[in-house]
From Swiss-Prot:
Belongs to the GlnD family. The gene is glnD. SUPFAM superfamilies: ACT-like, HD-domain/PDEase-like, Nucleotidyltransferase, Nucleotidyltransferase substrate binding subunit/domain. This is Bifunctional uridylyltransferase/uridylyl-removing enzyme. The keyword Transferase applies. One of its GO terms (molecular function) is phosphoric diester hydrolase activity. Modifies, by uridylylation and deuridylylation, the PII regulatory proteins (GlnB and homologs), in response to the nitrogen status of the cell that GlnD senses through the glutamine level. Under low glutamine levels, catalyzes the conversion of the PII proteins and UTP to PII-UMP and PPi, while under higher glutamine levels, GlnD hydrolyzes PII-UMP to PII and UMP (deuridylylation). Thus, controls uridylylation state and activity of the PII proteins, and plays an important role in the regulation of nitrogen assimilation and metabolism.
């Protein structure tokens, strides 16, 4: 029988096309996985027979193919089983077979082994053992295959296999940061993916509990309710992986940003005012993944307990409801929560209060998972349950652990239904990397760390403030509710206050405490916005902020919540510069609150000048050294710069006020990350654009800029710049900046135009529409330009260039980068901005240029 490769290749292609057509018409994932296996079985059997292999050999499917599941672009894993080592002629024939695999268009992974070699490999590698466990004979010697299966099964130690697979899962979880909620999860390998389901079946098969959900149910491994849930999750993940393979025409199991929107549209999701289509898709994914991780934990613990009955320890009674088994919390009665729903929250209190407990037994987890249904409106209204919930919030230890456990088991979202709505909700806003519920728990974790002595070195100011705060547990309540209204459309800070007030009243908080928590939720973004976007040297800014906070308690609570919130957004968002800005605002506000008076411009200037003169004396400079420079500076300069900066500028410039050459001075930032840079030169229209271009080329991002023109026509500009690549070479960069920037300004070299660089995939696939607004400031002398745009190389240069073209003059710039998102504020004047048409023209042009 000859091998017609072309005919087989055509058959493979036709089968694949027919499978896709059938799936699109029926939406039957199980049928697709089964039918693809059957089609491949048929093709491989034809190929095997056409090459006239000896009857002593066997061809078997292994891995997912052996299990009977072949996704559209899955690899096909084969085992060619030999009775003894292959002869030279057989080896040649096997090589021809492998060549034909590729010729007919199948991606095949294969191994050629004797039975003994299979057993040896299985003993050394748990992955090989797992693949062989699912072997299925395709064609060839049935007796040889039966011998292989019998010996493989005879060598299998179910307990050892269980422990190895559990360890393998732990290692896999570590590769994916131990979370199902990553921005771009792998629907096969990530926690909560298909692999978690397969692990259950592998262990069940090795232990003889069955290879279907129904068989696991019959053998008491899984309950009816859990079986229904797992079947639903498995079906969802199967469909997702199938659609991903068909959409891309190749094997790809990662839900990359590049695919999420297209896949969401494929599922019929439509973007609305509250959520992008991709966010809706991912919320469904995360909720399924969460269910899989919970049930995987329960079922693995259950099978582990069944495999080691002799290791059962004598329970130690904790109270009427609970006992300790080993170091795990166990319920004394399987029907505890049905009989006494009050015990649901007591379970988490027991975990919080008992230092010796490290987890819960499988039956406790299972009972709690089932007990979610007991959390009804009546349960939520019960004073005892409300008291227990408040006790959890007020605990001395284990707060974050237990709230995470409650969230994982679905208890938290049932007790607080509005929290349940944001579980698994991702925010494709270019800076959040956690789902809303995970972000809230991160914020609670940060607040908890402020109270712990072992983290005092990391959060010194926060640790001191929280130790002074009365009833610091109120911050956990504020954290729990600060983002609870995300995804509803509208202002989540405002909408969240309604939920917060209702919770506080229902849970017996005093009027004073309720007012504080509601105020924190309403204003949780304010301190961050003031610190990062407004001029903290302006007494009016500080006075307005003090009017909002009112007293020390509100200021301290808001500072702590703001710090915890920013750090809980993304590891990339926080840096020491933002920490310094927040601390500066806090210190200025607390100083004036303690003095009982709002800051006044004349008092601030006198204080700064006196302090600057005191600092100058340390350098053995005369008492009048400052006079020549300061005569050229107006009050705005002294309001915008600290005493330390004023002294530095004076020290550097007092002897060259009329210098013909530019003066550039740089130094490590005295109060945070990065470098401080001062530029002094005769003023010119495009100076800011030139400087921005230089820093962009040098790999530095400007986070703060103060632009000033002296009375005699010199620019005195100050910058704080951060190294994008975080290189540890400040000394070399100081010398480089001072020399290179001076030379470029002196010789009027062509402007450095920053390279456009590559956009991140996140920016590319979830672009945000630029927002630009220009409004007059409160004094009526300047205009405030605010913009929000996707961050990218050259963004600030684009803004500077556009302002120059429109004849607008820049006074200050506050540059805030939140992950991949830029939120910048500029104080500008000139350019006929008092004319409404000119303002609109500048806004329109900026929006056009800032589009991705």
């Amino acid at each position: 029988m000859s091998c017609d490769v072309a005919a087989l290749r055509a058959e493979v292609k036709a089968n694949q096309n027919q499978l896709r057509l059938n799936y699109e018409q029926s939406n039957d994932a199980v049928a697709l996985l089964r039918d693809r296996c059957q089609h491949v079985d048929t093709v491989l059997e034809k190929l095997w027979l056409s090459l006239n292999f000896p009857a002593s050999l066997a061809l078997a499917a292994v891995g997912g193919y052996g299990r009977g599941e072949l996704y559209p672009a899955s690899d096909i894993d084969l085992l060619i089983l030999l009775p003894q080592e292959a002869s030279a002629s057989l080896q040649e024939k096997l090589e021809r077979l492998v060549g034909h695999f590729w010729d007919i268009g199948l991606e095949i992974g294969h191994s050629v082994r004797t039975v003994q070699e299979c057993l040896d490999e299985a003993a050394n590698d748990i992955t090989v053992q797992t693949a062989l466990l699912e072997a299925r004979l395709l064609t060839g010697n049935t007796k040889l295959f039966a011998t292989f299966q019998k010996r493989l099964r005879g060598n299998l130690d179910p307990l050892h296999f269980f422990e190895a697979k559990r360890l393998e899962q732990q290692e896999r979880y570590l590769r994916f940061n131990e979370t199902p909620y990553s921005l771009e999860p792998n629907c096969k390998e990530s926690p909560g993916g298909l692999r978690d389901i397969q692990v259950i079946f592998w262990i069940a098969k090795a232990a003889g509990y069955g290879s279907t959900w129904a068989e696991l149910h019959q053998n008491g491994i899984i309950t009816q309710e859990e079986m229904i849930q797992m079947e639903g999750c498995e079906a969802y993940l199967n469909h997702l992986r199938i659609r991903l393979h068909f959409m891309l025409g190749r094997r790809e199991d990662r839900l990359l940003f590049d695919y999420q929107s297209t896949l969401a549209a494929n599922y019929g999701f439509v973007s609305n005012e509250a959520k992008r289509e991709s966010e809706q898709l991912m919320q469904v994914y995360y909720r399924n993944a969460k269910t899989v991780t919970v049930l995987n934990t329960i079922l693995l613990q259950n099978m582990g307990a069944a495999l080691t009955p002799e290791s059962e320890q004598t329970p130690q009674q904790l109270d009427e409801s609970f006992q300790i088994v080993g170091n795990l919390l166990d319920i004394r009665d399987e029907q505890l929560y049905e009989r006494n729903p009050l015990a649901i929250l007591d379970s988490f209190l027991a975990m919080q209060e008992s230092h010796e407990l490290f987890g819960m037994t499988a039956r406790t987890l299972r009972a709690l998972w089932r007990a979610r249904e007991q959390i009804t409106p009546e349960f939520r209204a019960n004073p005892e349950n409300r008291a227990a919930f408040m006790k959890l919030l007020q605990g001395d230890r284990g707060i974050v652990h237990e709230f995470r456990r409650m969230n994982q088991l679905g208890i938290l979202g049932r007790y607080l239904p509005n929290f349940g709505r944001i579980v698994g909700q991702m925010q494709h806003d270019l800076f959040h990397v956690y789902t809303v519920d995970q972000h809230i728990l991160q914020v609670m974790r940060n607040i908890r760390r402020f109270t712990m002595s072992e983290f005092a070195h990391e959060y010194p100011l926060c640790s001191r403030i929280i130790s002074e705060l009365d009833r610091p547990w109120l911050l956990y309540v504020a954290a729990l509710f600060h983002d609870i209204a995300k995804g509803r459309g509208g202002d989540h800070s405002e909408l969240g206050t309604v939920d917060t007030r209702e919770f506080c009243v229902n849970h017996g908080l005093s009027e004073e405490d309720t007012e504080l928590v509601v105020w924190l939720v309403k204003n949780h973004l304010v301190m961050s916005q003031v610190a990062q976007k407004e001029d903290l040297s302006d007494p009016d800014v500080i006075a307005n902020f003090i009017r909002l906070v009112g007293d020390t308690r509100h200021l301290q609570a808001l500072y702590l919540l703001t710090h915890a919130d920013i750090r809980g957004t993304s590891p990339k968002v926080w840096n020491n510069w933002k920490g310094k800005l927040l601390a500066d605002l806090y210190y200025q506000a607390i100083h004036h609150i303690n003095q009982g008076e709002a800051p006044a411009a004349h008092g601030v200037i006198a204080e700064r000048q006196a302090e600057a003169m005191r600092l100058l004396r340390f350098f053995a400079l005369s008492a009048t050294v400052h006079e020549r420079l300061w005569k050229q500076l107006d009050t705005v300069y002294f309001l915008r710069h600290s005493a330390e900066e004023i002294a530095w500028h004076t020290r550097s410039l007092h002897y060259r006020i009329y210098n013909n050459q530019p003066v550039v001075r740089a130094r490590p930032n005295q109060e945070g990350d990065g470098l401080q840079v001062m530029v002094y030169t005769q003023d010119q229209p495009d100076l800011f654009a030139r400087i921005v271009g230089f820093f962009a080329r040098a790999g530095y991002s400007i986070v703060d800029a103060k632009i000033h023109t002296t009375a005699h026509g010199y620019a005195l500009d100050s910058f704080v710049v951060l190294d994008i690549e975080e290189r540890d070479n400040d000394r070399e960069m100081v010398a480089y900046i001072e020399h290179e920037l001076e030379q470029r300004l002196l010789h009027q070299m062509p402007r450095d135009v920053p390279s456009s660089g590559r956009l991140s995939r996140q920016v590319k696939h979830f672009p945000i529409k630029p927002e630009v607004s220009i409004r007059g400031d409160e004094k009526g002398t300047h205009f405030i330009l605010s913009l929000v745009a996707a961050d990218r190389p050259g963004l600030l240069y684009t803004v500077a260039n556009t302002l120059t073209e429109h004849g607008a003059y820049l006074h200050t710039a506050k540059i805030t980068t939140l992950g991949e998102r830029a939120e910048d504020v500029f104080l500008i004047s000139g350019g006929d901005l008092r004319d409404t048409h000119n303002r609109i023209r500048l806004e329109t042009e900026l929006m056009e240029r800032l589009k991705v």
